[in-house]
């Protein structure tokens, strides 16, 4: 994914750099292959301002993440653990942080629920 000319970074590479910085600030390891797979899963929405962000203050959005991503894509059964994982990520990224990137959010959910095998 890396471009040899840093002045010509693609939008995805810029997102990747921002994501790495976000994880480093949280003291977490970055797995590029997993990140790339999640970006591919999310498709063009990662480049759309509203769709690229998660609003932890919106219960409908959090329910959609649980149903569509955790239960749908990751194949997990509905349980209190799913809601706990979502809240853990909301708090970990900062409840007052209005720019919780969906890629980071999903990446962290995959990691804490040990579902990396779905993507890599």
Tell what function each PLM region has.
Residues 1-4:
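Non-catalytic accessory regions used for complex assembly or targeting
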Residues 9-63, 68, 74, 117:
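Core of compact, soluble alpha-helical bundle domains
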Residues 15-24, 78-97:
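Short amphipathic alpha-helical segments and their helix-coil junctions
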Residues 34, 38, 61, 81, ...:
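Residue-level detector of well-ordered alpha-helical segments, enriched
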Residues 88-120:
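Amphipathic alpha-helical binding modules
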């Amino acid at each position: 994914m890396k471009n040899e000319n840093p002045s010509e970074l693609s939008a995805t590479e810029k997102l990747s750099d921002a994501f790495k910085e976000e994880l480093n600030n949280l003291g977490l390891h970055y797995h590029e292959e997993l990140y790339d797979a999640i970006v591919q899963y999310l498709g063009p929405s990662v480049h759309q301002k509203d769709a690229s962000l998660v609003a932890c203050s919106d219960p409908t959005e959090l329910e959609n993440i649980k149903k569509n991503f955790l239960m749908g894509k990751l194949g997990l059964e509905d349980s209190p653990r799913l809601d706990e994982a979502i809240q853990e990520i909301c708090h970990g990224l900062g409840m007052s942080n209005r720019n919780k990137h969906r890629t980071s959010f999903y990446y962290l959910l995959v990691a804490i629920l040990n579902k990396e095998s779905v993507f890599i």
